[in-house]
Each structure stands twice: as C-alpha cells, then as structure tokens.
Amino acid sequence: MDYFTLFGLPVRYPVDGSLLASRYQDLQRQFHPDRFASQPERERLMALQQAATINEAYQTLKHPLKRAEYMLSLHGFDLGNEQHTMRDTAFLMEQLELREELDAIERKADAQTQLASFGARVNETVKQRSALMIQQLDSQQWMDAADTVRKLRFLDKLQQQVEQLEEKLLGFE
C-alpha cells in the first residue's frame, strides 16, 4: 500500500496538511504499540512495524521534496538510490557560483545584509522551481519532474547552508 492510500489521500502532489496530520494522529492511536502490549509477540511486532511505516509515511508526505521524490518512485524513478549524474552543466556552474558567493559573504563587513539578500534570491529560485515541479507532477511529466527534483535537492542543501551561516553570524553556532 502506498503512503497516500495509507492516509486515505489522493495520489497527487498537493496534500492537505491538516488532514494529513489528523489522519496521522488517528493511525498512531490505532496502531500504537502500547495498545498491543498484551497481545502475542507476532501481533506486537506487526503493530510496531505498522507504527514505523506510519511514521515514515507521514514524514515523507509532510516534507514537500520528499513527497515529490516519493511520487516519482511510484512511477519508477528512485531518486533516493540513484547514481544519476547531473548533466545540466549550466545549472551545475550556477550552483558552484552560488556556493562561492555564499563563501565570500562570510568575510564581508555587511555579511548579515548580504546573506539576507542572497537567501531571498535562493528562496525565490526554490519557489520558481517548486512551481515548475508541481506543474510537471500534475501533468505526469515524470522525467522532467525528476530532473527538477534533482535540482531542488541542490537548492535545498544551499538553503541549509544559508541557515547555517546565518546562525554562525548571529553567534548561535
């Protein structure tokens, strides 16, 4: 059973977050291992396994990029385990330039202002690529969507690096 079906949701990218959370809580109550404490070991293990599957499914469907990767896996694109090499050299060069720019920001006198501007640009790029990905998933352009998800992975990592630098500049690190 796929994760969408497990939660009683249609297999499509947009997910009602509050409905997902509500169904998650219902399933957690239904399959919580404590409810099976007095049952035979086999049933306890099955409940434990089901609870783990529910947790994994919820984390996957809750996170936009993981949800897209999961949808693609349902259509034969296993991005989590692939050894695919990014062939879009223009995109890769852009990523290298962005990382160099991020590295240089730390040494600037107005680093926080520069970082805020840089972060806003990255967020806008993520927003645009996410909109493209949603369009591709909705129109079942799986190969194109897989390529966009691969690019969003790079951008997601870049966003994390922006957050780490922000914490460092603010003295939280």
Swiss-Prot record:
InterPro entries: DnaJ_domain, HscB, HscB_C_sf, HscB_oligo_C, J_dom_sf. GO terms for biological process: [2Fe-2S] cluster assembly; protein complex oligomerization; protein folding. Residues 2-74 form the J domain. It comes from the Bacteria. SUPFAM superfamilies: Chaperone J-domain (SSF46565), HSC20 (HSCB), C-terminal oligomerisation domain (SSF47144). The keyword Chaperone applies. The keyword Chaperone applies. GO terms for cellular component: iron-sulfur cluster transfer complex. PROSITE patterns: DNAJ_2. CDD domains: DnaJ. Belongs to the HscB family. Interacts with HscA and stimulates its ATPase activity. Interacts with IscU. Co-chaperone involved in the maturation of iron-sulfur cluster-containing proteins. Seems to help targeting proteins to be folded toward HscA. This is Co-chaperone protein HscB. It comes from Serratia proteamaculans (strain 568). The gene is hscB.
